Amino acid sequence: MSAVSALFIGNSFTQRNDVPALVARLAAARGHALHHALISAGGASLRMHLNKGEAQRTIERGGWDWVVLQEQSTLPIKNAKRFHENVRAFDAVIREHGARTALYLTWARRTAPESQRALTDAYRAIGAELGAAVVPAGIAWQRFLAEHDTPALHDADGSHPTLAGSYLAACCFLPVLFRENPLGIERSAPGLDDDAVARLQAAAAAAG
């Protein structure tokens, strides 16, 4: 058993359905413990978190193995340069205080699936530059949506995740934070049937 501490910084894409708690539930099923905290604000960009200062102060207090960064959902598409600047600023603080950076690669909106390529490229580029881990949630979403119609991953607004969408994202954290495969974890998603869980786990495993 291993214990990992992770600070999640983002917005409703992380807060909706409590993604950190879903990751912790999956980790527990593999015999690991995830101690987590979340700093979130609706629609927030990483720059907004930088300007507010709470996130940096929390990192500076120490005790984190990982800091997970989730950018505003369309900024990497519209302005990858600004996104990369935001990540660099956070990564410097994260490294200085002994933690590692994980980038939560998010998904395209339901009406603009073609934008996933730009999202993926933007996250991968800054991940490669900094040696940061990339959690490939958006890639897993893209793979799942290409093969399955149900369960729905997008909520009614076409942007935010359903429980299934958040669960799929959570599965993508296991290989990064714990070097564990999500395949075969049972009873890990109340509200989703076993067949749906198996399909979601398979998409996450394939994306890694």
Residue ranges and their predicted role:
Residues 160, 171-208:
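Conserved catalytic region of serine esterases and O-acyltransferases that act on ester linkages
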Residues 18, 54, 118, 122, ...:
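Exposed alpha-helical structural elements
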Residues 56-167, 171-176, 180-184:
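Alpha-helical cap/lid subdomain in secreted, periplasmic
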Residues 12-13, 109:
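Short strand->helix junction
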Residues 4-7, 13-88, 93-95:
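Conserved SGNH/GDSL esterase-like catalytic core that processes O-acyl groups on lipids
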